[in-house]
Amino acid sequence: GIDVDHFSPQDSTQLRKHLGLERKKVIVSVGRLVHRKGQDRLIESMPKILEKSPDAHLLMVGQGPYLEHLAKLVAINNLSEHVSFIGRIQYAELPEYICAGDVFAMPSRSRLAGLEVEGLGIVYLEASACGLPVVAGASGGAPDAVLQGVTGLVVDGNNLDEIAEAIATL
């Protein structure tokens, strides 16, 4: 389970202001920066998201071996004004950063012919407990953490159109 006393809706107005996101539709993604988590597809879907929501901003919280690749994707797609990398934060700060978002997204996907999948995806439950709708990838246990159409939407983590449409819908 999750600590619902820790992960609950919080006022992130000051954090959003500090990050320059007070007038943005913030898509927050929290997790280790690795291929399986689908952060690359989230970045690649941003142009489609921006067509529907020109004020959208992707806030990526976490660190990992995929950071350099993700930063290159941001540069290649001219998204530096629309994507922020926060890096590692303390556990105590997680709810405030999650609540800085309007929607939580981590379109995870399976790798290596299904041998590498997302586990339960507890971060989806934490985001839901914070009051955010979630977009999860259909990988491993992640779909089990989302009540389709109630707490969020499960998408094909490789389908940029599905990712963008789900985020626009929520």
Q: What residue spans do the PLM features occupy?
A:
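A short helix/loop element that forms part of the nucleotide-sugar donor recognition site in Leloir-type
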Residues: S8-G20
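Conserved acidic donor-binding segment of nucleotide-sugar-dependent glycosyltransferases
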Residues: A138, L147-G149, L153-L160, A168-L170
